[in-house]
Amino acid sequence: MTQCGDRRLFALNYHGAIQTPPPTDPNAAPAHRPAPRPALGRCRPPHRRRRRLRPPVRPPLSLPVALTTRSSAAQVGYLQDPFASLLYRPPMPQPGAFAPQAVGRARKPPLINVGTHHRTWGIDRLVDRFLQRGGKQVVSLGAGSDTRFWRLMSRATPPDLARYVEIDFPHLTSPKAQRIARHRKLYQYLGPSSTAMPPPGHPYTVSKGGTQLSSPLYTLLPLDLRPSPSEPASSISAILSHHVLPQLDPRLPTLFLAECLFPYMSPEDSREIIKWFGETFCSCMGVVYEMVGLDDSFGNVMKRNLAVRNLSIPGSIFSTPESQAGRFTSPMLQGGKFDSAGAKTLWQIREEDVGPEELQRISKLEILDEIEELRLVLEHYVIAWGTKGECMSSISL
């Protein structure tokens, strides 16, 4: 594959923007495709007006793509994640049909696997340092099928967490709740974190039509953070206060995670989320992961292919690591302003944090010749963080 081809595949596959269809034989006869059957519930009389739906905050494919990239990295040996296969199993494609899930299931190119390793390495270090400083609560925004809770609680010495809350759309929390309830390897960790033995029976309750799962330690919360058009007086901060705050203790040090979420929100909405956490918790930390520098050819490819699917990234105006860090210390946050902030690209994390032994280990897993190409890709993704409170002040990468 050419360098340009590698770059395009990484830009679209790794971030979850769109999948590239498999190559076809130009000399092959065109396959017969039956006429598509109408979807149930979508046949409407011509005179009826179609109800307008709000676009999703992030691409619908970002959930399976994000998890399959992680599964690919774990399969090759970059990561250890025994829970990914329990939380997501892509459906089998129909014979002769192109399905994005089938592409997502395949092993990813080395560029993507290395990027997934560095992303996980950096965020894991920040989360661990938060917990080592007495952090007690974690809120994962747009969690999808993230496995971090289980990776933390399955450690030989699990952290002393008080609450772990995952938030996403109901159509995404529903299958996750079903899989948690189905697998004892998942629900055995839902009890109090101080207990080494799994609690008897099922330590959780399922509600809201199967979209919410709650336990003394863990909550999977179905929630759309966007204000409803039917309630113009509502705001993101009001939604967070009404639905999320009852799950937490504002007196405890709290971390919020937003991985590939804010680009699909307006800068005003993401600022309101950061401000709410800074105002609500006197000791707080935020970690954001997203892309930067999208004004070059790499970013233009991503934006063009998102536009094909009628998706945009209005929150991608923070084009440098410095501007990403500045989101936490902006005067516009007023009382929600964080005390300190920082940011690093994945390339900086590779150069400064991963370490020679780990780099040597992963270099033996796959052949990766184009280091300059890798650098170009990794410099377009950044991990930014902000801290507030005395015990959180020195946390950084």
From Swiss-Prot:
GO-annotated molecular function: protein C-terminal leucine carboxyl O-methyltransferase activity
Enzyme Commission number, as recorded: 2.1.1.233
Compositionally biased tracts (Basic residues): 44-55
InterPro entries for this protein: LCMT1, Ppm1/Ppm2/Tcmp, SAM-dependent_MTases_sf
Positions contributing to S-adenosyl-L-methionine binding: 119, 142, 168, 224-225, 259
Record field: catalytic activity: [phosphatase 2A protein]-C-terminal L-leucine + S-adenosyl-L-methionine = [phosphatase 2A protein]-C-terminal L-leucine methyl ester + S-adenosyl-L-homocysteine
One annotated GO biological process: methylation
Keywords noted in UniProt: Methyltransferase, S-adenosyl-L-methionine, Transferase
Pfam families: LCM (PF04072)
Ranges of Low complexity composition bias in the record: 26-43
Region (Disordered): 17-61
Enzyme class: transferase
Function: Methylates the carboxyl group of the C-terminal leucine residue of protein phosphatase 2A catalytic subunits to form alpha-leucine ester residues.
Family the entry assigns: Belongs to the methyltransferase superfamily. LCMT family.
Listed name of the protein: Leucine carboxyl methyltransferase 1
Organism: Cryptococcus neoformans var. neoformans serotype D (strain B-3501A)
Taxon lineage: Eukaryota, Fungi, Dikarya, Basidiomycota, Agaricomycotina
